[in-house]
Amino acid sequence: MLFLLFAPALFAQRVGTWKNYTSFRNASSVAVEAQCAVWVGTDGGLYRFNRENGEIRTFTNIEGLFETRISALTYDSGRDGLWIGYESGAVSFFALSDERFSTFLELTRVTQFANRTIRKFFVRGDSLYVATDFGLSLFVVSRREFRENYIRFGTFASGTAVCDVLIAQGQLIVATALGLARASLRSTNLNAPTEWQSFAVSGGINALAIQGEEIFAASADGLLRLSRSGLERESGFPQKNVIALATTSNDLFALASDELIVRRRDGSLVRRAGNFSQSRALASDADGQIFIADRRQSLLVLGAGTTVTVITPNSPLSNSFEIVQIDAFGRVWGSSSLRNGGAQGFYRLENGVWRNFENLPSPGTAPVSQFSSLVSRGNTTILGTWGGGLFEFDARDSLRVLNRSNSPFVGIRQSESFVVLPSLAIDQQGVVWIANFLTAQNPIYAYLPNGNILRFGTSGLGPGREFPSNLTALRLAIDGNNRKWIAVQSEDGVTGRGIVVFDDNGTLTDVRDDRYVLIDERQNFGRLPHPKVNDIQLDNDGSIWLATDRGAAYFFNPDAVFGLRIPNASLVFDLRNEFLSSLAIDALNRKWFGSQNGVWVVSAGGDSILMRFTTENSPLLSNNVRSIAYDRKTGKMYFGTDRGLSVLYTEAIEPQETLSALTIYPNPFRIPASTRLVVDGLVRQALVRIISLSGTLVRELPSSGGRLVEWDGKDRNGNYVSSGIYFAVAISEDGRQSAIAKIAVIRR
């Protein structure tokens, strides 16, 4: 039978392509593009809000940004583009006409100062003045180069941060962390501190603005006016911290944490109360419409009266993905923190839409804004939390909480109600195994499908028969014989102490036959590369793999750890001394390690590095990879970082059970091409033959064990084939199954 299947939209994402998800909530800057749109810079990238239809378009590094942490933004009406400043000191210009980014990196290479964040821009003709954390830089637009850096202003210390810059009345004026400084534009040597007149202000100057012929400065103590003699307080203006300033032809807008104050040209004030405690920047259009960049709500649009419209792009609450896991429905869950300290919520991605969770109630303890581990059982998604116990979400997102008040779970020694469940794993019988951290006894729990919860670890039977009382359980995995591999720490939860392997011998209700063995860095006790084990995974061949503070290790035969002598772990030589935070194993049995230096991909046997992904050679959001999750059904690899979630589409898709229909894409296949043709729908270890219309064998493509193979359009001699019709014939490893599909090749 001939199956001719062309590429549906389902396969629009090609193997090797990336997608990034970031939070657009924490806004740093805002700029108005004429009258049609507002641009917002955030610590997750850039977005454009169309004021006419409400449409939001987002930009990350994949769409052309140099990086995602934006710190400054200015619309250049003369060039119809955006000047974008980044935390790193990089500066980009985004031309709106052709949507092209030009990036200038000179300031990132300044080594004299540690902080190089861009704070503000001021455009004047061919000059762009750039306020930075170490001073003021002059960029000549036509020459596309930085001409000078000014780092000393009058009596202020060298490298004082500049928060804003303004040119008015023949003066170059800078707002700094120590106060205000000004110099004449006619000066021939602005690098000389003596050319600058400085005015110290306690708390510094936050922003500058000009209204008519008057120059104003925002300070921690209210609004200041700059005169020939210096700075003086604006009469009648309240003495409070002014965060930001903006102007129209008539009005000056001053933003404080509790109100927006409008100063008219005649000096009168109009005050509008509001909660602006998280606001950071302010912009207005020609009609006086106000737009505020906010740390929590992203963009606030102030309407008539007291109306405030909140514009928040659909995105996760935070860019911190300390945890990333996938449930049985293919939904992606991320958590801002492993622990409760510093937690900023957790989030779930389903069908391209994010749902955020924070401050969920847990009776008897503080609200929960994170999770530490996740498993699925039936229609239920079960989350272990740091302090809140166990959270169960059903298919309708109804929440059930199990904690100290209604279950056997025990809190930490200092607080019985603070139940820490940092790791969950589910066995083939549907039993959810749970690590209970920092408890005085019974650090292992089994949550049965019938709802019962059993405790393990403390039996009084002595060494080797119970969990070591001087250790606490942090992370848990299950091997092919249902033994539990538990990464442990010292009794106080601070120091890594290796792994405890627990065997219940298949008798959940009889602890008398339970066995425990400790594996650590000692000879004949496993010889781990480091006792701090950060992740444990079972590979496709039954071996146990570890990610530690000092490299990777594996036990080829996990059963051997209960022998007379514990065999030494095998090490991955190329990852020695590498801090490894996380681990995932794909359908091709490759090992993917997260680290502080990006992602490492190791061969199935651990003998070679196949690939490495960093911010320098890929769209990976950050080299600080905290967690990795893998979806076997789609081949997607998810990398949780401190700057968001990166997704790589890989060829490692779980193979089909039976070989029936093949899908070919792209079809027709135009060669030469930068992309490859994909044959999809294979069983494990299938072989694909490319055959010409006359029956000649053109190429053999062995499967690596996954659902698809790729063809570059070349024959066995490395030459591109001619235009015409070809067939892809797939044969199972045992030769009992086969499938065929037609390929149209167009050679250009």
What are the language-model segments listed below?
Residues L697-V721, S732-R736:
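Glycine-centered tight-turn motifs at strand-turn-strand junctions
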Residues E67, S722-S723:
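Surface-exposed loops/turns
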